[in-house]
């Protein structure tokens, strides 16, 4: 049998590239001498590593000495294929641990200063920008609202202008032709400060995918990435051992964001705000709650989106006069599941920042205004983390996600001393800067600090790119400023509008059940409160009405008395108020179990009221006489009578 023709294999190391002519039947350990001839003289032969990808980027790295008996053709290498080589020099191999394959031939350096080898270097794990999705418009599942807005043309139609239009009723000219949803003149005329998300997407898409170019479609949206790329193709060791112009982030130029992911926040009922304010009125401490609701179309803005808040859940927290400390929320997933069965999702967060003015008229101090701040640097960092936890899925982004619909609301005093709601979102750049650990909150609430690479108190090796922003200087000229050490928080903020519906029709009609995690002011959720709300006294409609309370639903879920089907029925009754579904609920085994638990715990419905002695005696019917007994009842018969009376309250 004739010998196989030799092939050319390409090799790349951090010292450069070279080629070798090898036989397909040749085994890998036999290549060691040829490889060492093309490497520096101080290379430790036993440290040679081969990989199909650059060293340190997640490829299949194998020690050359471990490939004994493995031929080149066995692993499928062909003529012209490329392999990557990693190695240690002899001095480094003597000092380094045995399991460490690759180290830099120079000491680790951070901002020019050497980093000790014993130091643990931590990285932020979020996905690299290279993790793009092939054809995201076919794979990514958007929300039904986004799909509906995508199908709309978004044009702003104008009537015929009788003064400027010289054509007939079926004609069209520049004065009456439809406008794009991102038309700047229309936005200025309607005093719309920010583009809606779908308007911005169409504006970017118009420049990215021009019809006249007839090129393949490219997703127009791409989130910023301010971290060192972990998958650099240059072949050097990963950061902080090595860095190049391909993997280091570019300088950041901050500017106000021209669009917003959500345009409006609508509270279904003023009672939602009043219940949160009641805690501050009773304790004087601040309070935080998460907003549960839905996203709907907002017609006041072209292709707009609004968050409709239906419930506020208050997680475990420690409240003080000047701040809030959030504790671990152990039942967060359970609350999210109850909200999901009600057709809701977590749409935002709201917190108070109130201080009584001391006038005795209910007025509060105005802390947030144009000369101070609207959202502090600490609050922006908190909002950024919340938005990073709730990304928005969209098929118009290369990574399948872009921004977040999560909103942040503040209850504080205005210039007139009244309590008002303000709604905000952190910008896309703010979320990425917080994720990349580039900025940190300041003691001065109106400014954000830029991290320093020299600050290694947290044992982190971070790369901080240059950050710039533009401002009007003392000469009235827009000049670029270096953001170090701090810059105004307005560059990281997007304002939203808010309001209440003209005719309130909240999803949950009842709001008298105690709110969770309020033991500090003497309010707690107990079984007696359940009995008080659900006892119908012969009126089943009362129980159906009173079950429409989000806090009651969460409490009943924690009791684990209902099956999944019964709990879904319970949530449907609470949200739709359907009497037919309500009667089905009252006859389920789970409801009977609830009645039994209330009975055995002593939480029984109140007895029928005693007759006033001044009232005339009521005649006793023959049916009632049959229930009378001349002998005293045994404890057993008494409990049976109480059970029958409780059953007659139409709880089941």
Swiss-Prot record:
Membrane-topology descriptor: Peripheral membrane protein
Main location: cytoplasm
Keywords for this protein: Cytoplasm, Endoplasmic reticulum, Membrane, mRNA transport, Nucleus, Protein transport, Translocation, Transport
Superkingdom in the source lineage: Eukaryota
Cysteine pairs bridged by disulfides in the record: none
One Pfam family it belongs to: NPL4
Function according to Swiss-Prot or TrEMBL: Involved in the import of nuclear-targeted proteins into the nucleus and the export of poly(A) RNA out of the nucleus. Has a role in the endoplasmic reticulum-associated degradation (ERAD) pathway.
Protein family (similarity comment): Belongs to the NPL4 family.
Record's protein name: Nuclear protein localization protein 4
Native species: Neosartorya fischeri (strain ATCC 1020 / DSM 3700 / CBS 544.65 / FGSC A1164 / JCM 1740 / NRRL 181 / WB 181)
Gene giving rise to this polypeptide: npl4
């Amino acid at each position: 049998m004739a010998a196989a023709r030799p092939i050319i294999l390409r090799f790349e190391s951090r010292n450069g590239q070279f080629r070798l002519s090898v036989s397909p039947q040749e085994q890998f350990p036999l290549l060691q001498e040829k490889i060492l001839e093309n490497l520096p003289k101080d290379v430790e032969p036993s440290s040679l590593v081969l990989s199909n990808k650059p060293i340190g980027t997640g490829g299949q790295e194998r020690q050359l000495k471990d490939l004994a008996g493995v031929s080149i053709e066995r692993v499928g290498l062909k003529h012209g294929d490329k392999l990557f080589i990693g190695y240690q020099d002899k001095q480094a191999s003597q000092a380094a641990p045995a399991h460490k394959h690759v180290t830099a031939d120079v000491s680790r350096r951070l901002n020019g200063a050497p980093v000790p080898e014993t130091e643990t270097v931590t990285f932020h794990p979020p996905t690299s920008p290279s993790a793009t999705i092939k054809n995201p418009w076919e794979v990514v599942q958007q929300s039904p609202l986004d799909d509906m807005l995508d199908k709309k043309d978004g044009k702003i139609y104008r009537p015929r202008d009788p003064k400027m239009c010289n054509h007939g009723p079926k004609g069209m000219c520049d004065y009456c032709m439809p406008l794009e949803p991102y038309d700047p003149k229309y936005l200025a005329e309607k005093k719309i400060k920010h583009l809606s998300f779908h308007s911005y997407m169409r504006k970017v898409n118009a420049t990215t995918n021009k019809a006249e170019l007839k090129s393949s479609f490219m997703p127009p949206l791409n989130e910023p990435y301010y971290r060192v790329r972990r998958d650099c193709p240059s072949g050097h060791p990963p950061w902080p051992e090595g860095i190049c112009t391909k993997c280091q982030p570019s300088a950041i130029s901050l500017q106000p964001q021209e669009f917003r992911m959500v345009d409006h926040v609508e509270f279904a009922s003023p009672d939602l705000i009043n219940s949160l304010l009641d805690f501050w009125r009773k304790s004087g401490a601040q309070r935080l709650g998460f907003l549960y609701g839905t996203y709907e179309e907002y017609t006041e803005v072209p292709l707009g989106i609004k968050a409709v808040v239906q419930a506020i859940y208050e997680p475990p927290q420690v409240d003080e006069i000047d701040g809030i400390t959030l504790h671990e929320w152990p039942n967060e997933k359970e609350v999210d599941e109850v909200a999901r069965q009600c057709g809701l999702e977590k749409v935002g967060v709201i917190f108070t920042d109130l201080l009584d003015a001391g006038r005795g008229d209910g007025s509060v101090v105005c802390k947030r205004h144009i000369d101070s701040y609207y959202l502090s640097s600490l609050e922006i960092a908190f909002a950024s983390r919340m938005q990073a936890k709730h990304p928005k899925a969209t098929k118009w982004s290369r990574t399948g996600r872009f921004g977040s619909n999560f909103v942040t609301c503040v209850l504080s005093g205005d210039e007139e001393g009244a309590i008002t709601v303000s709604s905000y979102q952190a910008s896309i750049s703010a979320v990425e800067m917080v994720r990349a650990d580039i900025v940190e909150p300041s003691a001065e609430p109106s400014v954000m600090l830029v991290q320093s690479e020299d600050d290694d108190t947290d044992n982190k090796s971070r790369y901080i790119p240059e950050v710039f922003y533009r401002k009007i200087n003392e000469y009235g000229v827009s000049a670029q400023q270096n953001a170090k050490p701090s810059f105004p928080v307005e560059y990281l903020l997007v304002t939203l509008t808010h309001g209440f519906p003209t005719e309130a029709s909240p999803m949950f009609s009842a709001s008298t059940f105690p709110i969770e995690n309020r033991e500090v002011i003497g309010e707690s959720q107990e079984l007696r409160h359940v009995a008080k709300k659900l006892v119908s006294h012969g009126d089943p409609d009362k129980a159906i009405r009173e079950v429409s309370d989000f806090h009651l639903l969460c409490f009943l879920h924690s009791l684990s008395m209902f099956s999944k089907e019964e709990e879904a029925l319970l949530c449907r009754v609470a949200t739709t108020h359907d009497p037919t579904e309500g009667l089905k609920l009252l006859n389920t085994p789970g409801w009977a179990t609830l009645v039994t638990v209330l009975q055995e715990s002593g939480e029984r419905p109140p007895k029928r009221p005693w007759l006033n002695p001044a009232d005339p005696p009521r005649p006793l019917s023959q049916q009632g006489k049959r229930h009378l007994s001349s002998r005293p009842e045994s404890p057993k018969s008494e409990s049976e009578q109480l059970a029958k009376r409780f059953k007659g309250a139409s709880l089941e």
